[in-house]
Amino acid sequence: MSAGKIIQIIGAVIDVEFPQNAVPKVYDALKVESGLTLEVQQQLGGGVVRCIALGSSDGLKRGLKVENTGNPISVPVGTKTLGRIMNVLGEPIDEKGEIGAEETWAIHRAAPSYEEQSNSTELLETGIKVIDLICPFAKGGKVGLFGGAGVGKTVNMMELIRNIAIEHSGYSVFAGVGERTREGNDFYHEMTESNVLDKVSLVYGQMNEPPGNRLRVALTGLTMAEKFRDEGRDVLFFVDNIYRYTLAGTEVSALLGRMPSAVGYQPTLAEEMGVLQERITSTKTGSITSVQAVYVPADDLTDPSPATTFAHLDSTVVLSRNIASLGIYPAVDPLDSTSRQLDPLVVGQEHYDVARGVQGILQRYKELKDIIAILGMDELSEDDKLVVARARKIERFLSQPFFVAEVFTGSPGKYVSLKDTIRGFKGILDGEYDHIPEQAFYMVGSIEEVLEKAKKM
């Protein structure tokens, strides 16, 4: 293959000069003699290409020799990747030796065509009451977990992986994009303890890594998930955190010399997001269900990054700081969270009616809160008092102890089937549990546990 030399280094962006008749293509992988991999982003003319470094550019200098591999970055795929931790290039970082996969795939691939795509409306039960009731997930759908800093995106995601791996025994791919290394480490040990590590492939490009790694690691994970899908499996693809993917794009974009757009984001924000999201789809052979944590800067949902992400999702799970401050976990906001699946034709009339009934009562309670704050409970009509009492029970019943949080809470985790969830909330709406104190509904699984807890009070 052709060889060139480094002529300029600006942080993670490196210019390499090649002979005029052997200029690398955009997205080709280049190898520096020091062992670093570069990816071509732009052809500047005169044989010069501008690349991003997929690794630290420490120690690089002008004049170093660069080889063109002639192909995009390729990563190992298939069952050999299960139970392993890899970096953006698909190299193992868990000190367990080579991956040894029979096949490697390029990380840049075309999205499936219209003919290949399938549209299923099958539900994926998560065992988390508030999600199954208010914003049910579709098999092969896309889910966003929205929340500011520290409201529980990662914990919710870990619980989903644990529940789905154990209850549905499916394969998962987890892409850690620009998140804390400590969380990645905790996550690995959590998976080992739950005995589900052999069903998960882990790909990490964490906070301390250069922007090139964080920008490409989501594509590395997605490529591994696509391989499982094309083998006819139903695979889960988890991304934590999609905002850091956007942020890495912003860093790279500025270094590449592009003009910034709104709030300083890259002008190619919508396109970069689309390239990733359009590949996360289900075909007639298998499905990819994706769960993406979305950090919301300063709790502002109108920020260009979360706003662009919203457009691609089937379900949005919004985590609220106000609910977290009440001590109700998972801190999912039942009035803000949505799902395309919440339709009588998909979930059935009973589920739809119960979910809308729960939202109706909580909305009414929200309106009455101002009156209660000024005039007190005594000024409310009897009907409104009943609404408030039921709403407070519903609020507490939406909380649930998690398996992955047992270490912190000391209470064992609970998995609640969709049938039990609907039955429980229907009972509260119908007034069957009006005589039970609201404390009994807090941090329990099914409605039977509420009755048990009430007996001890």
Swiss-Prot record:
Q: Topologically, how does it sit relative to the membrane?
A: Peripheral membrane protein
Matches recorded under InterPro entries: AAA+_ATPase, ATP-synt_VA_C, ATP_synth_F1_bsu, ATPase_a/bsu_AS, ATPase_alpha/beta_chains, ATPase_F1/V1/A1_a/bsu_N, ATPase_F1/V1/A1_a/bsu_N_sf, ATPase_F1/V1/A1_a/bsu_nucl-bd
Which GO MF term does the entry hold, naming one? ATP hydrolysis activity
EC number(s) stated in the UniProt entry for this protein: 7.1.2.2
Where does it live in the cell?
Cell inner membrane
Q: Which UniProt keywords apply?
A: ATP synthesis, ATP-binding, Cell inner membrane, Cell membrane, CF(1), Hydrogen ion transport, Ion transport, Membrane, Nucleotide-binding, Translocase, Transport
Q: Which PROSITE patterns match?
A: ATPASE_ALPHA_BETA
Binding-site list for ATP = G147, G148, A149, G150, V151, G152, K153, T154
Taxonomically, the superkingdom here is Bacteria
> Which chemical reaction does it catalyze?
ATP + H2O + 4 H(+)(in) = ADP + phosphate + 5 H(+)(out)
Enzyme class at the top of the EC tree: translocase
Listed under GO cellular component are: plasma membrane; proton-transporting ATP synthase complex
UniProt similarity note: Belongs to the ATPase alpha/beta chains family.
Q: Could you describe the subunit structure of this protein?
A: F-type ATPases have 2 components, CF(1) - the catalytic core - and CF(0) - the membrane proton channel. CF(1) has five subunits: alpha(3), beta(3), gamma(1), delta(1), epsilon(1). CF(0) has three main subunits: a(1), b(2) and c(9-12). The alpha and beta chains form an alternating ring which encloses part of the gamma chain. CF(1) is attached to CF(0) by a central stalk formed by the gamma and epsilon chains, while a peripheral stalk is formed by the delta and b chains.
Q: This protein is called what?
A: ATP synthase subunit beta
